[in-house]
Amino acid sequence: MGSLTTAPDWYLMRGSGVVALLLLTAVVVLGVGTTKRWRPARTPRFVTLALHRSISLLAVCFLAIHIVTALIDPYAAVRLLQVVVPLPLGPYPFWLGLGALSLDAIAALVATSLLRHRLSLRTWKTVHWLGYASWPLAFAHGLGMGSDSSTVWFLALAGASAGAVALAVGTRLLGARRPYPKYLGTALETGGPA
């Protein structure tokens, strides 16, 4: 941390980035869980889906805080264009570029989720596969760019996050595929057969 930055900006940027990564981990695990229909026996599917959506919204909020504080912090020196386009600028262009690519994937996920009632299942599902790409990009961004990436507490959180996602995705990829309805519409909203 340099003299050009204020401690609250710096800590808010770091903290919101870590919280966003943890929430994105939960979103991926819950997303995989909804495709596998993981849930307690007495919990309707729409509850699991609502939790997935709610945590997704919270993750996007913390991601927005992370981005805004990075933009206003003079020490971070992040430009607006760098947030969405991986550019070879600044001291860590590769790691910042991974964050930009992750944000782009997350933006596509949010947009298609908001428009899911107007999209075919195939389109929505194809774009939703970006979730599997956005998480490792965000994870690598945090490991490479984060000022806490060499601390024991961060490495423990990162290891737990990686383990949770690897277990969920591994289970998803090794499990049997289930058919989906032609259109998402009411099946996802009501917890009906999907």
Protein language model annotation of sequence segments:
Residues 1-194:
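Membrane-embedded alpha-helical bundles that constitute the cytochrome b-like, heme-associated redox core
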